[in-house]
Amino acid sequence: MKDMNSIRYVFFFFSRDIKSCFYKVRSYLNLLLILEAILCPVDSLISIPNGIMVVSEPDSPFSHSNPSRRLFRKVNPSSCLSVLYLDLCCSGLIIAEAGIGG
């Protein structure tokens, strides 16, 4: 069983505001890169109601891969959305963090 303390979660919540879509595309990708530099490598993006959950596993073999490839990695195709899809239909800001492990 995986040690939950080794996994970091960052929650993003989005509103359905199409007007700010074009602005968000750029700022959202920049935000992910900043979070990766501050917190830990981003290993996957999981869809949740009204947003996505960024999951990072520090000991994962993906931890040192190319950041641009990591941003689009999916854990389960039936429950995950890519950044590109979210950029087309959502806009939003990070409002909470949870489960930051050591």
From Swiss-Prot:
Its main location: membrane. It is found in: Membrane. It comes from the Eukaryota. Keywords: Membrane, Transmembrane, Transmembrane helix. The chain crosses the membrane at residues 28-48, 81-101. One of its GO terms (cellular component) is membrane. It is a multi-pass membrane protein. Partially overlaps GIP4. This is Putative uncharacterized membrane protein YAL031W-A. The lineage of its organism: Eukaryota, Fungi, Dikarya, Ascomycota, Saccharomycotina.
